[in-house]
Amino acid sequence: MTTLAIDIGGTKLAAALIGADGQIRDRRELPTPASQTPEALRDALSALVSPLQAHAQRVAIASTGIIRDGSLLALNPHNLGGLLHFPLVKTLGQLTDLPTIAINDAQAAAWAEYQALEGDITDMVFITVSTGVGGGVVSGGKLLTGPGGLAGHIGHTLADPHGPVCGCGRTGCVEAIASGRGIAAAAQGELAGADAKTIFMRAGQGDEQAQQLIHRSAHVLARLIADIKATTDCQCVVVGGSVGLAEGYLALVETYLAQEPAAFHVDLLAAHYRHDAGLLGAALLAQGEKL
């Protein structure tokens, strides 16, 4: 059975056909509409899936935000242009006339990355550092989603009580500092207004402020990982996302994590499936009907 997998992120929408063998075919992307209107997202999703839906027997969605009762509830609306709520399962069911499931994108990615691990690992945490910061937790070989879908939203734990206000309403969240959006928001002077990709490029060229912003992000993430180790005693942490997979970033995180007491150290791995983990994880969960 072929699954039409969809990944809804703060920057881009992706879709692909995924067979029972886990092979990804006909992958395509569109920019995520920066609009508060549900119609804009519906139209973009329609354009994305229309060339693919005839070749699939079901739909699996991995989306940013809390997924509850098949709907997207934005914990940080800024990541979706201000959109607060969107009926994912209902909308894709109407667009495709196919059975549809939905799960948080980081939870989906965690499940895919867990399947790729070698050895006797039963407990792992996946962290995505991208437009926002999200996560997924596998404990005892089972994916934790929580009764309300909130499990794994580790980007909204505290990094700095005097830090910037996060889009979720809290102050000093990890996401507000370590994410691509957080890195860009802290830029000043000639870097003001630059996006995270530009800041990473400037850091590679030796720009001191750009390097400081990236180090700040990596340091915050390392402290988060130490907290996660203390909370879950996980055997490894897998890092993905456009920032998490940026050249040199994970090495910085490892350097800062090494400065923590040894009890809080944990193996760090780069995401095996890179930017396709959410798509694949959603399809795997649909195949296993675990949602």
UniProtKB/Swiss-Prot annotation:
It catalyses: an N-acyl-D-mannosamine + ATP = an N-acyl-D-mannosamine 6-phosphate + ADP + H(+). GO terms for molecular function: ATP binding; N-acylmannosamine kinase activity; zinc ion binding. The keyword Nucleotide-binding applies. Disulfide bonds: none annotated. Zn(2+) binds at H156, C166, C168, C173. Keywords: ATP-binding, Carbohydrate metabolism, Kinase, Metal-binding, Nucleotide-binding, Transferase, Zinc. ATP binds at residues 5-12, 132-139. It holds the Pfam family ROK. Its EC number is 2.7.1.60. Gene3D superfamilies: 3.30.420.40. InterPro entries: ATPase_NBD, ManNAc_kinase_bac, ROK, ROK_cs. Pathway: Amino-sugar metabolism; N-acetylneuraminate degradation; D-fructose 6-phosphate from N-acetylneuraminate: step 2/5. GO terms for biological process: N-acetylneuraminate catabolic process. Homodimer. Belongs to the ROK (NagC/XylR) family. NanK subfamily. PANTHER family: N-ACETYLMANNOSAMINE KINASE, ROK (REPRESSOR, ORF, KINASE) FAMILY. Catalyzes the phosphorylation of N-acetylmannosamine (ManNAc) to ManNAc-6-P. This is N-acetylmannosamine kinase. It comes from Escherichia coli O157:H7. The lineage of its organism: Bacteria, Pseudomonadati, Pseudomonadota, Gammaproteobacteria, Enterobacterales. The gene is nanK.
